[in-house]
Amino acid sequence: MTKKRVHELAKELNIENKELINKLMQIGISVKSHMSALENDAVEKVYHQYGKKQEKSSDSANKQIQREHGRGQGMEDKKEKDQLFRPDNAKGPGLVDRVPNRPPDRRYEDKAKVAQKPAQELRGSKTTTNSENEQTAPRQGSAQQSGQGRPQANRPQGSQGRPYGGRPQGGQSRPYGDRPQGGQGRPYGDRPQGGQGRPYGDRPQGGQGRPYGDRPQGGQGRPYGDRPQGGQGRPYGDRPQGGQGRPYGDRPQGGQSRPYGDRPQGGQGRPYGDRPQGGQSRPYGDRPQGGQGRPYGDRPQGGQGRHYGDRPQGGQGRPQGAGRPGANRGAGPSIPKPPEQVAQPKPTKAPDKTKGDRRKNYEKDGKWADGQIEKNKLFKGRNNKNKKRQHQQSAPPPILDKKPVQIAEVITVQELAEKLKKTAAEVIKKLMGLGVLATINQEVDFETATLIAGEYGIETELKVAVDKEALVMAEPEEDEDKLVLRPPVVTIMGHVDHGKTSLLDAIRETNVTAGEAGGITQHIGAYQVERNGKKITFVDTPGHAAFTSMRARGAQITDIAILVVAADDGVMPQTIEAINHAKAANVPIIVAINKMDKPDANPDKVKQELTQHELVVEDWGGDVIAVPVSAKNRTGLDNLLEMILLVAEVHELKANPDRMARGTVVEAELDKGRGPVATVLVQNGTLNVGDTIVVGQVSGRVRAMIDDKGRRVKKAPPSTPVEILGLSDVPEAGDILVAVEDEKLARDVAEKRKIRKREEGLKSSTKISLDDLFKHIQEGQIKELPIIVKADVQGSIEALAQALEKLTTEEVKVNLIHTGVGAVNETDIMLATASNAIVIGFNVRPDNNARKLADAEKVDINLYRVIYEVIDDVKKAMSGLLDPEFKEVVLGHVEVRKTFKASKIGTIAGGYVTEGKIVRDASVRVIRDGIVVFEGKLDSLKRFKDDAKEVAQGYECGLTIDRFNDVQEGDIIEAFTMEAIKREI
């Protein structure tokens, strides 16, 4: 016996190969793949596992025959209906192949022989009784008693199990030849006189090779064999005493040429002929003594409503014989004789036959059989064997449940065409019909897309837009079993020059302060220290007032805040700010009282000042840990580290290293050789080289990672600070880093954020409306100080921008037209030339080309290393833009003692300088009785007919006032001038 392979057995059991392999493993049978061969006992075990027994070949053949010939009741009825009354579907093998003397098809011989024995067992004891009943019944009488005019009724002396009953005394020239009494080599097996085991029953004394057996005293060339005393050429054989040319044989004493034969004593005009003593208007005519309204007429003394009527004393086991569903046993009453002539119904018009059907109905002598042309027109395609086979093989198309097409609020024509499964040209044509001229890349709204889909009968629904940014930023739920302890993140905060970086240097045993400009920290640094086998991550923040955002950012990413306070200086403004940041972030605070080595150190003063800000140390009954240290002498450091580890242990800081990384950008810069570089603190998950990340408005792939000691690493677990390379641009400090799996998703989120920030910048920019235009013209032009800032790191730019924007006043505004990380380049100089801006470089230098271009364009480049100097110089520049204040300075007074009138000059006042001096170009006021009569300019000043620039106190002078001649004796003329005073911010 051939061994079965795994895939063959899986196919037989209708399961997947993988499922079968797993099942074999469970029962102790080892297989390597789906091509492995299985022993018989292994196959038996599998059958036992799935509750299936191994079938024998005879049973399989029997079941196959039962499936082919519709042994079930419901399948039998349906098949018989299709064969009798739906000719287009009756094209199976052995049904209506009318080619004369066609040799038998040997493909069915083996199948019939194998099926003979189980078929005999199925009919068993019923055979003897049926055979005796059929032998005692007269031939013609049996046809009449079983109801004449029935399609495919039994024939006398019939064998059991035949679809059309037995045919005695068969004729010649049948499509499949005669059946002898043994009848070997027939496509459906032998027909013995008992007819057991044949799928279509036996033929008594029959001809060989006929698909439907012999007809008694039959005519030649009939596709369904002879009928007793019947006419020739009928598709279903003769009926006793019947007329010719009827598609279902003769009816007793019936009329000729009716499409479905005569009915005895029947009414005319019925589509399928008359029925004996029947009611009219039935779709298939009357049945003798039958009930009305049955789909296939009455049966004599039979059960009503049966599809194929009764069989007289019929043999059991026949597809249409007695003992089948819908049939009665016993003979019915004789049918009354129908009238000799009945009006012939109008023939039904049918479409022309195909070439293959016409050829099958053409006889050897080149002539058509009697009545064959008309009947072939009625039953087009009945004999098409290939079509029947195709009909059996082709399954009906599955009914698809049409789901609504999801369409976004805005969709391009090309995408809409793809969703509707149409071409873009068809969709554009529909749009033009709606009056919309669109190209394939043009977008249409949801309503228009719905109208187009409705034209094709497709329903639509609005697709809910997925917020990709929310999807990326969503924090997944953590599995408690996967959380492990992580190092604490400690931020060192405090006032400037209180020793924060020196304390961190002492812990790290390095010297960072030596390399800092001005001795102050101006950007965040992240470092990792290992002490007693446990790691601690330190984040150093600036203490200067300009770096508020850095301190706030440091507090947000930290687990523990170390507040450094100088023992000799106490709590200062930035110390208070750091306390507020730590409280806002809900971070535990450890106070490090530094500079204990100084002689004037006073730790109690520090503790007392801390209580004013709700920080009560443990020594005073509070819960705040205070540790005195000296960064210079390196004392108290071990105690400080122990306190850090203690607080971290109490808070049980945990993270999941097996998930996608998430962290915060501590600092970012543009390196000339490496490109954008970001210092990132990984807070959760593990960041690996090659991960796709999105950082604020920037996305990219991690090309390399460098730890705080300058070593390249391949992965960064939680609480690890690393520098990453591979970003598309310099991110902003404080941005959240998220590792994602889809690179396209990262790009989309970054681009969306960039667009949103640009729109926010446009909205926030101050604009002068038409309503305010006249007001601004009257008040004077708004003065702006355009500035271009270039710095070494992103954090410094952030600090500078915030510090400079605070300098803005109502009269002068600081306009940061461009900020960037990296050296000053030619683009910055060209932008400064166009906008008349000043260039500020913080810890960067201009390259040679930029310096040459700046000299040519006369652009001033200001370079700084300390943030104090930047703020002071910008203040001076802004002060120069302010309008000066004017102050009135009184020069002197002149008493008018005599007036003279000159025709060409006007009134000349002669006076005496009583106080100060009087200057020729000075402004004057004419005061009369303490009231200012006129204020204007001095026109001329003379002494003894000579022009004088000024006249001092105690001297006389003559003067004229511009556009004023009403000077009287006794008036006081006050000389004054307006002096401009420079304003400062």
From Swiss-Prot:
Alphabetized UniProt keyword annotations: Cytoplasm, GTP-binding, Initiation factor, Nucleotide-binding, Protein biosynthesis
Region described as G5: spans on this chain: 630-632
InterPro entries referenced in this protein's UniProt entry, alphabetically: EF-G-like_DII (IPR053905), IF2_II (IPR044145), IF2_N (IPR006847), P-loop_NTPase (IPR027417), Small_GTP-bd (IPR005225), T_Tr_GTP-bd_dom (IPR000795), TF_IF2_bacterial-like (IPR000178), TIF_IF2 (IPR015760)
G3: region residues: 540-543
Region (Disordered): 49-401
Boundaries of every tr-type G domain copy: 485-654
Amino acid composition bias (Basic residues), ranges on this chain: 378-391
Compositional bias (Basic and acidic residues): 49-58, 65-89, 99-113, 349-377
Function: One of the essential components for the initiation of protein synthesis. Protects formylmethionyl-tRNA from spontaneous hydrolysis and promotes its binding to the 30S ribosomal subunits. Also involved in the hydrolysis of GTP during the formation of the 70S ribosomal complex.
HAMAP family per record: IF_2_B
Cross-referenced NCBIfam families: IF-2, small_GTP
Name of the protein described by the UniProt record: Translation initiation factor IF-2
Species this chain originates from: Desulforamulus reducens (strain ATCC BAA-1160 / DSM 100696 / MI-1)
Gene from which this protein is expressed: infB
